[in-house]
């Protein structure tokens, strides 16, 4: 039964990656409702952007935060971006910073860059160019070559 679960979940993820969003929604929704973070994350993206359906901010936040609560790195990064931009939720730079920190700790380079920019600009935290440079370097960028 576990193999069948993985095949069906894999089909939903493949449909998402192939931009077959209506099919992806149908395939992924049961797994998201059962608590699968990868399915929840993808439903969150579809709701946030309006892929295969009308944009739904409340559902976008629900699915993205459900996946993030399980420590799913991409969802932590996505939720951080939602908080940073005030998209699908109230803007909260402190919560954005916390999400990006968790995602960066999981090795997500995009989260490291977002976090570095927050430290560089003093958003949600005190300005700290040393931390910003260290994060840019950890993400694979030459901090000295980046604009300040």
Each language-model region and where it sits:
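Canonical positions in the second alpha-helix
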Residues: 29-31, 65-67, 102-103, 138-139
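Structural signature of tandem alpha-helical TPR/SEL1-like repeats
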Residues: 17-26, 54-63, 90-99, 126-137
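Alpha-helical segment of the N-proximal tetratricopeptide repeat
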Residues: 4-34
